[in-house]
A protein has these predicted regions:
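Gly/Ala-rich beta-loop-alpha elbow adjacent to hydrolase catalytic centers
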Residues: 178-182, 186
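Short beta-strand immediately N-terminal to the catalytic nucleophile in serine-hydrolase-like folds
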Residues: 176-178, 204-206, 271
């Protein structure tokens, strides 16, 4: 009997700890769960990158550009760089009037070089002309401090400020790329700049969620164990959950606000894998509706579904693309892809294509 009761007791204790802000933030961000005990992320060569192109955050140069300047870049001092502006890598980024920069915001747990993250940087830079700037938020990896919603958005804004004001990359040559938790960070920093009238080349959100309480109601640990167990099926429980969650991460509201405050040009791309076992792909439906709803007015559920269907191309039984364009140069795009899971999708073609479209390298499909 005691053996049978032990898992239930543990689960109830876990839920109880989850309402305490200290434990809740450790559960959410998992920032102390990483491989720094046996990995040195100040030596990115260990993940297959060319020598000499890193800073506190990682700056990953496009490999073709590295090849052109290999003699000077490869002879730079390796390891942690305290003044990136004195490096050849910075000079190549800042002196190129056509440089394109992707600022990458990773998901929870670990650091910028953990698991499949380096593979995604390779996918974006190995054959392109794009620079990638990937950061660890406060409390993650070697970064100091403790993570919270306000702090992570401030970290992201600091990096964007640096890119615009120090590296002199204009916003129309910057794409904000977020994955999982990073989609909430990207949405938060994009909203912050939208309120100032700043418009980026694009906002690409991969495996996103509408808000933390809603996401948790469908989240499964390892894709199998429901985070909230039977509580997820109680309609009033989400309201209780939202009351106790300290970091709300209301991304759907933020996307709507971004659309509302955009005056000229906007590109929002939502990419999700059908076989994502961590965050349900249906979360993108809520984000798309929040963003598109700002341009089409209020529709009831049936009216919106009918409207959306008219702008959707079903590419297979497990995939579709919905593209909504307005006369004000706003494009909101949702793509469901059959494969890629929660993490590997970052290295799949739909993400790279979404970034290309953000930089106005438009194709002809689904127009």
């Amino acid at each position: 009997m005691w053996v049978a009761a032990a898992p239930l007791t543990f689960y109830i204790a876990l839920i109880g700890l989850g309402v305490i802000p200290f434990f809740q933030r450790h559960f959410l961000y998992a920032h102390t769960v990483n491989s720094l005990w046996w990995s040195d992320i100040n030596a990115p060569e260990g993940w297959g990158f060319a020598n000499g192109e890193t800073i506190y955050a990682w700056h990953i140069m496009p490999l073709p550009l590295y090849l052109q300047h290999e003699a000077r870049v490869a002879t730079q001092e390796t390891g942690l760089c305290h003044d990136f502006t004195r490096t050849e890598s910075f000079r190549l980024l800042a002196s190129d009037p056509e440089a394109r920069l992707i600022i990458s915001f990773h998901g929870n747990a670990g650091h910028i070089a953990q698991n499949t993250r380096p593979d995604s940087y390779h996918a974006l830079t190995d054959t392109s002309s794009y620079h990638v700037l990937a950061i660890d938020y406060r409390g993650f990896g070697h970064s100091t401090g403790t993570p919270d919603e306000k702090g992570l958005i401030l970290d992201a804004a600091t990096v964007v400020d640096w890119a615009i004001n120090v590296a002199k990359i204009p916003p129309n040559r910057i794409v904000l790329l977020g994955h999982s938790l990073g989609t909430a960070v990207a949405s938060g920093v994009a909203e912050r700049y939208a309120l100032q009238g700043v418009e980026f080349a694009g906002i690409v959100l991969v495996a996103a969620f509408s808000d933390l309480a809603t996401m948790l109601s469908g989240y499964r640990f390892g894709g199998l164990v429901p985070a909230l167990g039977p509580f997820a099926f109680w309609p009033f429980f989400k309201r209780i959950l939202d009351r106790y969650i300290v970091d709300k991460w209301h991304s759907a509201d933020r996307l709507a606000n971004i659309v509302r405050h955009t005056r000229n040009r906007l590109r929002i791309s939502l990419v999700h894998a059908k076989n994502d076992m961590d965050i349900p792909w249906t979360e993108d439906n809520k984000l798309f509706r929040a963003a598109a709803g700002e341009t089409i007015g209020i529709l009831d559920d049936d009216e919106f579904d009918s409207w959306k269907e008219s702008w959707t191309v079903q590419t297979s039984k497990d995939s579709f693309v919905t593209t909504w364009k307005t006369g004000e140069d706003t494009i909101i795009r949702q793509e469901l892809f059959p494969f890629g899971g929660h993490n590997d999708i970052l290295g799949f073609a739909p993400v790279s294509l979404a970034i290309m479209r953000s930089f106005d390298l438009e194709g002809t499909a689904y127009d």
